[in-house]
């Protein structure tokens, strides 16, 4: 298991969603079907035997990342799979190999190393090392530069674009009364669960807008590569994320470009993995020289590199889209800070806009697997069709409490840690997605807003894994 990230091996990695203990890999077995399925005994040598009608030695099972994506045995426990290309060991290997090629002047094989850092890991690292959030970004950039990074970026522009695309998609669906309730798509744990468990029933409701990570992948491998005049395959793009499931998302075939022979995101490391790397370096984050983050999208960078998007903690989808839709569809301007009403628990909240006594917009935020299950079951029974949009995140409290965020210190409760991270987030400057820098990317690189090119690069599709599984034998390990 040397290829598995050490952070995944050594910690409790349930990422707040209770995984099924039944991993299913479709294996064709020529035997009669039974009502109970085949029982498998795992042996010490990692082989297993089928023991229903006499013992039968089977081959060793090798589970790749693609097997995991095509499987519905677990829900989101990507972290339990051997993801050899998504570990800090692999990252360090690539960085060292690249430094060696530079030292030997093997310029034809030198890769451009680009890091992209999401906001939530910066909050986690800032709290862990007791420094400011913007400072944590600059010190982290310095650390990555010391490892051999050529560029270090923030996800700000991708966060902005994701909101612009998602809100426009919602307004179009609302006007056409098509595929509502619309469900957010930025959480890979939620998308993986939907594909594996509910298939074609739920998939049309999910927004086609790519997550900020994958939008950033497009910008780096298409836009930035063009600016640098290097092939996309020659760029090694690393993202720093709050969630192990982002590793699975980056590995989807939808995000591999056959034209460029390159993935949009080559490697994902997480907050807790960065902490582990820093621990192994025997230095704290603040001990690395601070370096400004790069801003390759225009000549003038923004005043800050780390921004909040509304007051909600997972990208601000529900809040931002609600405000935009109220103005765009009904010429209503809600208060700058919306108040969501808590329902059965703090992770399920809703907000309503009424006009002439009628409810014209009804949005919700559903965080945590329990609320996701309830939401889907109600959708199937037709009981939540009055919700127009739901922001769905797999982790309780959303991405700020992601399964790969740095763990609480001894004696500190998860709720207390989450509250402190929320305070850090709420003190960040607020980003307006309709800023001139974002508009510049649309005009200069995407042929404008709502163009064929922008849709091709900024949207994705989903797959009914359930129907594929119905063709295979259900095996309990």
From Swiss-Prot:
It comes from the Eukaryota. One of its GO terms (biological process) is iron-sulfur cluster assembly. [4Fe-4S] cluster 2 binds at residues 187, 243, 395, 399. InterPro entries: Cytosolic_Fe-S_CAF, Fe_hydrogenase, Fe_hydrogenase_lsu_C, Fe_hydrogenase_ssu. [4Fe-4S] cluster 1 binds at residues 23, 68, 71, 74. Keywords: 4Fe-4S, Iron, Iron-sulfur, Metal-binding. The keyword Transcription regulation does not apply. The keyword Metal-binding applies. GO terms for molecular function: 4 iron, 4 sulfur cluster binding; metal ion binding. Component of the cytosolic iron-sulfur (Fe/S) protein assembly machinery. Required for maturation of extramitochondrial Fe/S proteins. Belongs to the NARF family. This is Probable cytosolic Fe-S cluster assembly factor GG21400. It comes from Drosophila erecta.
């Amino acid at each position: 298991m040397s290829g598995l990230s050490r952070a995944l091996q050594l910690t409790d990695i349930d990422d707040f969603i209770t995984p099924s203990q039944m991993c299913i890999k479709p294996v064709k077995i020529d035997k009669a079907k039974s009502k109970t399925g085949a029982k498998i005994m795992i042996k010490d040598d990692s082989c297993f035997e089928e023991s229903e009608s006499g013992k039968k030695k089977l081959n060793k099972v090798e589970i790749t990342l693609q097997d995991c994506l095509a499987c519905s045995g677990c829900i989101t426990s990507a972290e339990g799979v051997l993801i050899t290309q998504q570990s800090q060991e692999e990252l360090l290997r690539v960085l060292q190999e690249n430094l060696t090629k530079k030292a030997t002047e093997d310029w034809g094989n030198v890769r451009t190393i680009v890091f992209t850092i999401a906001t939530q890991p910066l909050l986690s690292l800032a709290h862990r090392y007791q420094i400011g959030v913007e400072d944590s970004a600059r010190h982290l950039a310095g650390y990555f530069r010391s490892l051999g990074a050529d560029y270090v970026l923030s996800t700000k522009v991708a966060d902005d674009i994701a909101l612009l695309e998602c809100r426009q998609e919602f307004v179009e669906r609302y006007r056409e009364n098509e595929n509502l309730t619309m469900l957010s798509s930025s959480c890979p744990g939620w998308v993986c669960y939907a594909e594996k468990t509910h298939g074609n029933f739920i998939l049309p409701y999910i927004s086609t807008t790519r997550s900020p990570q994958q939008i950033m992948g497009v910008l780096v491998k298409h836009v930035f590569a063009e600016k640098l005049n290097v092939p996309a395959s020659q760029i090694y793009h690393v993202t720093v994320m709050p969630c192990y499931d982002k590793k699975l998302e980056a590995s989807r075939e939808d995000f591999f470009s056959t034209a460029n022979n390159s993935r949009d995101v080559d490697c994902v490391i997480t907050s807790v993995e960065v902490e582990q790397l820093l621990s192994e370096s025997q230095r704290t984050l603040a001990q690395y020289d601070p370096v400004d983050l790069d801003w390759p999208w225009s000549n003038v960078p923004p005043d800050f590199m780390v921004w909040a998007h509304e007051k909600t903690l997972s990208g601000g989808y529900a809040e931002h889209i609600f405000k935009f839709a109220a103005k765009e569809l009904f010429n209503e301007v809600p208060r700058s800070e919306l108040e969501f009403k808590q329902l059965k628990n703090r992770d399920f909240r809703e907000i309503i806009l009424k006009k002439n006594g009628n409810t014209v917009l009804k949005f919700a935020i559903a965080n945590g697997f329990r609320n996701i299950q309830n939401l889907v079951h109600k959708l199937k029974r037709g009981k939540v069709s009055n919700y127009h949009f739901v922001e769905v995140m797999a982790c309780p409290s959303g991405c700020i409490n992601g399964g790969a965020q740095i763990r609480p210190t001894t004696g500190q409760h998860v709720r207390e840690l989450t509250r402190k991270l929320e305070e850090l987030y709420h003190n960040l400057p607020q980003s307006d997605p309709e800023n001139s820098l974002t508009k510049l990317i649309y005009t200069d690189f995407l042929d404008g807003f709502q163009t064929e090119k922008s849709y091709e690069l900024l949207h994705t599709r989903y797959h009914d894994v359930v129907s594929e599984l119905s063709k295979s034998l259900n095996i309990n390990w």
